[in-house]
């Protein structure tokens, strides 16, 4: 993929998945996570994408560390980034690659916030494996490959 450009309050790169493959655009919002919709909403409008063609990769504390699941739509689970995306995309019915990061021992909102915003507690190799699995699932979704 080409070097990203600054657009839509984020870093955007466009290209194909391979020779003759589908065109894709990858947007990495440069907003705070809880304002990601400010980036994704205008990008979706500019590309005139149907909502089910928008894929969001996000952390998921309701999944154990290492699990990666894909689904269309669903609840927000208290995730402020998803709330922002729903608001600015107009609906929660976008594709999601849910990356399990596990839940902290405390349910206190401040502890949960510190957990998801803090450094990884798992060994570097396990984190690299998780990122690779998330990338694989995202590629399957984009290429429409059944599981």
Ranges and model annotations:
Residues 1-73, 83-98, 105-113, 123-147:
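Nucleotide and nucleotide-moiety/phosphate-recognizing core
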Residues 76:
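Conserved TIR/SEFIR loop-to-helix hotspot centered on a Trp-containing motif
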């Amino acid at each position: 993929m080409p070097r990203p450009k600054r657009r839509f309050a984020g870093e955007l790169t466009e290209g194909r998945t391979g020779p003759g493959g589908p065109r894709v655009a990858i947007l990495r919002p440069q907003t705070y996570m809880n304002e990601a919709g400010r980036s994704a909403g205008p990008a979706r409008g500019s590309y005139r994408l149907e909502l089910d063609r928008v894929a969001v990769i996000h952390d998921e504390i309701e999944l154990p560390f290492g699990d990666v699941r894909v689904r269309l739509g669903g609840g927000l689970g208290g995730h402020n980034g998803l709330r922002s995306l729903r608001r600015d995309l107009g609906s929660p019915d976008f594709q999601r690659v849910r990356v399990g990061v596990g839940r902290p021992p405390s349910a206190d909102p401040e502890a949960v916030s510190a957990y998801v915003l803090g450094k990884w507690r798992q060994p570097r190799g396990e984190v690299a494996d998780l990122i690779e699995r998330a990338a694989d699932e995202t590629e399957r979704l984009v290429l429409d490959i059944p599981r």
